[in-house]
Amino acid sequence: MSRFIDAAEQLLGGPVIPECPEGVLYFAEAGWHTDDGTGVHGVKFAAYFDDLTAANGALRLVPGSHHPEQHARLAAYERRQRPVRIDADPAAYQASIPGYVAATSPGDVIAFDLHTWHASFGGQDRLAWTAVYQRCPETAAERDRTLRSVHDSFEQGFRGFDRDRYPVWRDWLGGAAAHPRRAPVIERMRHAGVLDLPGARDGW
């Protein structure tokens, strides 16, 4: 965890707070999208448990698409391309936006800005572990966006989740004293109001 915190702080240029990490089974394909819906400044780390290439579902990313001006151009372009749907003509949809194929082997970790456009094509079932870190909010507006984003992640992550069969990491908060790197992160979460959100204690 501390390695990811250090990397996130270096990439985002300041202190960070985490969202709940997730273990995810991806299947089929995912069209071009970003992972930010509220305007937060964050980075996502993804580790896949299979060897992935362009042929079997490796993550594809559009370099530079996290910059606002490039994001706006891509969004406008995608709207013009809407008649080309992934289910109607997969090859045409895949070719409609060029992307870098991040081929990976187990043990590799991909880090990308939440605003980066990414997709996956030709996918098989693939298991991944992901963790998101946000830049610690400094203004009331940033705090509001952070809380909405984290709340959304709780809703998606724990709605209908069988916590008895698949326990969450309930000792992360309680065991902070034994991990000096963790304590200041928890204090940032508490100060930002993250730990007051519904579901926060279940998630951590």
Language-model-detected regions and their locations in the chain:
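Conserved double-stranded beta-helix
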Residues: 1-61, 66
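Short histidine-centered beta-strand/loop micro-motifs
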Residues: 31-37, 103, 119-123
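Extracellular structured ligand-interaction cores
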Residues: 40-46, 56, 99-101, 117, ...
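Hydrophobic alpha-helical membrane-insertion segments
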Residues: 42, 72, 122-124
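Short N-terminal helix-initiation segments at or just after the protein's N-terminus
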Residues: 45, 49-54, 71-77, 188, ...
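Low-complexity, flexible helical/coil segments
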Residues: 51-58, 78-88, 95-97, 143-154, ...
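Double-stranded beta-helix
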Residues: 55-118
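Non-heme Fe(II)/2-oxoglutarate
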Residues: 115-204
